């Protein structure tokens, strides 16, 4: 192994990072010519990082099924550079002094490759700056990467906008085994209520 290689240990939700293991019929050809599902996002990131910064990075990737699984992994001694729990779990980890502050570079907008710092919603950044635990802002230890993402993703060649405009699509027999929801317990409860209530 090259001693100059940076090792980045990442743990996030199952199915959140594309591992490039799609079957041929699952790949998506975009108008741009890109093919989604052809490469692993991890391999693409490693290549991009070396091309951009001139240093090799090796991503060691693991997943968890629930926030509590991640918490158990951490309390049993697993160590990661980046974890992606829900807000209540990062708050618990922060309160229990289990997180390391983000680097000074994390919010550096002078780096044109710092896509998070440049592109983060001012609203989300403001919340993370204002909310505190133990007198320290959330933004010292965490960054919001998703906010209000509960919804329906659909293929317009198969489903109309009108059909996808209601949670009732989830219990419409016409779409049996053709639609799914985000693999998240809390979001699933919300979607189930939406599917059951006829006025939503």
Kindly give the residue locations of the regions a language model identified.
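Active-site-proximal beta-strand/loop segments in catalytic clefts of secreted hydrolases
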Residues: 11-14, 64, 150, 155-156, ...
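Short, solvent-exposed loop/turn and secondary-structure capping segments
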Residues: 20-23, 93-97, 155, 164, ...
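Short hydrophobic/charged patches on amphipathic alpha-helices used for structural packing
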Residues: 71-72, 167-171
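Small-molecule pocket liners
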Residues: 148-151, 190
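Extracytoplasmic/periplasmic substrate-binding proteins
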Residues: 158-164, 175, 183-200
């Amino acid at each position: 192994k090259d001693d100059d290689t940076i090792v980045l240990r990442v743990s996030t939700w199952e199915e959140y990072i594309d591992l490039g293991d799609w079957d041929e019929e699952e790949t998506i050809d975009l108008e741009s010519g890109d093919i989604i599902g052809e490469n692993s996002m991890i391999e693409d990131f490693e290549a991009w990082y070396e091309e951009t910064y001139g240093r090799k990075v090796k991503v060691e990737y693991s997943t968890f099924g629930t926030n509590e699984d991640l918490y158990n992994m951490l309390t049993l001694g697993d160590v990661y550079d980046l974890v992606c729990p829900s807000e209540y779990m990062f708050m618990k980890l922060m309160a229990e002094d289990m997180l390391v502050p983000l680097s000074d570079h994390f919010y550096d907008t002078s780096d044109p490759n710092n896509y998070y710092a440049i592109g983060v919603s001012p609203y989300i950044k403001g919340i993370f700056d204002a909310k505190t635990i133990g007198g320290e802002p959330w933004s010292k230890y965490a960054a919001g990467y998703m906010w209000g993402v509960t919804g329906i993703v659909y293929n317009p060649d198969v489903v109309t906008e009108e059909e996808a405009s209601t949670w009732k699509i989830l219990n419409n027999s016409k779409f049996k085994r053709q639609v799914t929801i985000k693999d998240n317990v809390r979001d699933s409860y919300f979607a189930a209520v939406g599917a059951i209530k006829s006025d939503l």
